Amino acid sequence: FLDVVASTSDDSLDIHLLPQSKILCHERQLIPNFVGHLETMDQDWRSLQQHLRREGLPELGALPEKNVRRVSDHRDVPDYFKDPGLVRIVTERYGDDIELFYGNKTTEQLIQGE
């Protein structure tokens, strides 16, 4: 699966598989001034709600729980990345995202969920 994703051009790739940097950046500049992270989604959602309140904008309500497929336990993630070739493919395909959103972390820290 990952080999196909990695070898498919952005133009032909489903939007759900595109690197986020292709969607959120223009000329390598991040356009939104707030981007939540999956790892801190509850906290980020609260921060977004507070910002909307301060600006007098409508609240979004509770964070929707759509497409939830697993619990918050991600201890099995390192098992998926034991193969250095797989790590290479991911970092090549999604390297801009890793740099943009996790530039202060090493690949190993990301794999371990740190």
Residue spans for each PLM region:
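PAPS-dependent sulfotransferase catalytic domain
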Residues: 1-80
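PAPS-dependent sulfotransferase catalytic core
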Residues: 25-26, 58-114
